[in-house]
């Protein structure tokens, strides 16, 4: 964590006794709890990391809620992240988030692997974040959980830290409708295969950046404002049309409003797939497992009626909601053990 923690922690006037008490309190979390019969010290350490991670995640969520709109710069609600992760199912390979905020996508990916009895070492994590404060939050978030990642601080569009990366999975929640991305300096960029995005809105710059970094059998899942599905301003409609005609759009999910701390407007999830006949192949070697051939097809899921209000301004998706959305996608895709897909009027 060198260069990450604020310099205030090293200043001479700091109450060293109080700081020591805090350090001891954190150090005691789960490390000194009795071990169940048959479990070794490694289990205790894992529990300690998980507990610390949960505490950190809790405070991130509380901070994002208190900050309101500005909180959206670093925090994606955990339930939205879980929808993305459950649908992409990143068991093995390279996971990439070019605007990773506080690192929630990475944390959720590792949780998914653990929940499905996978091996953490089977995935490699790459990312980039332009906001220095947010980058520091992510570094601490990952360090607390013992997650190893190749994450960089810098502008993804203008100084791509992973220019040659071809990822098996891309997960992201880019800034909505960002007009301050200096797009006028990148008009002829090689990433704009489907058309130069407008300088006043980075939505389709992000989409094409994701596509650029996808492996031949790669999958991408990301959050965008609902306007991305219908906007025709400044050539956005033509870019969207070109992406659709390239048969990259695998699934679209319309989510209910009030899920985010930063905005009350409804958002949607985009899922792109380069190869609609195979699952991702770790490391880009050949092809992965076969699934139903969905070339020329796209699944639409209308989840706008799901979720429940947890307070006056915020809604949250339940575990049942998550299972319903992800289950429909995996059944449609033809994943092993997902069951038969059936159209449900008003939902999919």
Positions of PLM-derived features:
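Conserved S-adenosyl-L-methionine
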Residues: 70-172, 177-181, 186-193, 204-205, ...
């Amino acid at each position: 964590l060198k260069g990450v923690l604020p310099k205030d922690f090293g200043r001479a006037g700091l109450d060293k006794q109080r700081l020591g008490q805090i350090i001891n309190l954190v150090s005691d979390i789960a490390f000194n709890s009795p071990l169940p019969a048959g479990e070794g010290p490694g289990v205790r350490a894992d529990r300690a990391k998980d507990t610390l991670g949960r505490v950190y995640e809790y405070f991130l969520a509380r901070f994002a809620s208190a900050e309101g709109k500005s909180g959206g710069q670093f925090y994606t609600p955990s339930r939205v992240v879980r929808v993305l992760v459950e649908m992409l199912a990143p068991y093995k390979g390279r996971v990439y988030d070019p605007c990773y905020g506080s690192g929630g996508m990475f944390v959720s990916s590792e949780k998914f692997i653990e929940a499905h009895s996978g091996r953490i070492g089977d995935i490699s994590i790459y990312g980039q974040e332009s906001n220095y404060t947010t980058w520091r939050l992510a570094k601490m978030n990952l360090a607390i959980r013992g997650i190893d990642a190749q994450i960089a601080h810098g502008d993804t569009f203008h100084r791509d830290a992973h220019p040659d990366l071809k990822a098996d999975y891309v997960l992201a929640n880019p800034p909505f409708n960002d007009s301050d991305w200096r797009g006028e300096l990148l008009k002829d960029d090689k990433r704009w295969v489907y058309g130069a995005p407008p300088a006043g809105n980075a939505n389709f710059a992000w989409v094409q950046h994701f596509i650029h970094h996808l492996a031949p059998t790669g999958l991408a899942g990301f959050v965008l404002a609902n306007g991305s599905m219908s906007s025709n301003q400044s050539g956005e409609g033509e870019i969207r049309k070109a992406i659709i005609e390239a048969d990259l759009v695998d699934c679209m999910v319309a989510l209910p409003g009030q899920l985010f701390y930063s905005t009350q407007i409804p958002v949607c999830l985009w899922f792109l797939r380069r190869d609609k006949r195979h699952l991702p192949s770790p490391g880009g070697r050949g092809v992965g497992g076969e699934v139903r051939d969905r070339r020329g097809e796209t699944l639409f899921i209308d989840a706008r009626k799901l979720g429940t209000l947890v307070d006056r301004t915020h809604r949250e998706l339940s575990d049942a909601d998550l299972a319903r959305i992800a289950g429909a996608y995996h059944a449609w895709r033809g994943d092993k053990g997902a069951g038969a897909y059936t159209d449900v009027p008003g939902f999919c």
